[in-house]
């Protein structure tokens, strides 16, 4: 039998272990054509409406602002095409706040027109500052040289061929003057000719587990000059992931991290090839950066690269776990003592009387898709900084019924990507990325017993708002909640007939209790206010600036 060339390449890259997954994908693809058609329509609508959205979104803020700081952009250049450098300079000149300087360090460009434009910029506006280096030190070395030129109290990284939104300087300085020493913003991509904007990247607030899985921070990264100097700027030896390494080190040392949920940076997509080998080099560098951080923090884990993604396996200690299996339906084989209960109404007292280190809440009718799912949940639950741990719940059509809860939505709580096909358009690779979330479903939830009891256990909800509420209570005492894609569960046919999101159709009493406890806008850190409130993680194109 002849295999297509792309299959042969994947086997060469990943080994024969990829074949079963590829077969499952082809079968699922055949079954999911209606879902793909719906998703394609949503993507097209987002694409069509985004140009108007970004024009509205970029309208300068009208409220008065008086800067008391200056922002220095660190811009390494090397043979930059003059038209791209000119576009960047113009985006700086068009800033709504003029308290900036641009520190260009040129790594011995051989293009005369690049050097000529840099020289001309210094004559055009004295905020453009240029140093011509004797050699090209690479991205890290050139950026660090630009850092030595900076005079502003705050500094920001900027690529030589990208664009800034008009309020970029203002928004960063507002955050800095509010006490932040590490700031990052949302971003999107722009076509090579600078006319078409696409693929907005709407980020969560600071999420340490998400950051270890991949550099979601990216552009714009800004920090106080004191903090940037304290961490040593960019480190050589992390080519392709030097920004990721920097974000990890800044996050460890920052006193206050602020995420600005506005698209303030446009990353230009040029026609440059990005081979698998380059991707592997970037992934390997990211894994080294993450491993370095864990060593600095004295956190014991193995860090590897799987499918070009960073995978962390935390060293586990012995834990006594008891499973509370609830609801009707079949139960999987469980490697721990199991207590079967009809529902979770009286479970708090049961946990109080149970002698264990951690509790696994598991709904009957779920079937594990990953063989080491228990150890995957346990390795996060044992961490002192973690509250609830959960994973993906997939229905019989491979669609997400749960992938972590967002709470600042009209229905009280909604699952990330509820009802969307697993192989479709997962935002930040939901099926492969460990993420921090506000809450997880009580259908699959592991938590240390002492944490569960210290926050008062489950509140008396009739719906799965209990899981979102428990996550908020853990968050309230400074703990993280974790979604891992490596402990997935498949629903049986009966559960698959439930609404796309487990909180959908919650009783009015549950919604009233949730609002009374957490207010009209609960503290949601990980689901962008620019997303649609249905959990789809598509941008809300109808949203007007200033609306909650």
Q: What role is predicted for each listed range?
A:
Residues 10-67, 280-319, 397, 409-436, ...:
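C-terminal, non-catalytic tails of nucleotide-sugar-dependent glycosyltransferases
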Residues 90-99, 329-338:
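Short, acidic, metal-binding catalytic loop of nucleotide-sugar glycosyltransferases
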Residues 106-117, 135, 159, 328-330, ...:
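A conserved acidic beta->alpha catalytic loop
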Residues 133-150, 343-354:
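Glycine-rich, basic loop-to-helix element that forms the pyrophosphate-binding segment
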Residues 140, 148, 190, 197-226, ...:
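A recurrent flexible, glycine/aromatic-enriched loop bordering the glycosyltransferase active site
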Residues 155, 359:
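Short aromatic/hydrophobic "clamp" motif used to bind/position activated sugar donors
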Residues 167-197, 270, 366-411:
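Conserved donor NDP-sugar-binding/catalytic core segment of glycosyltransferases
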Residues 227, 237-263, 290, 374-377, ...:
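A short, conserved alpha-helix in the catalytic core of glycosyltransferases
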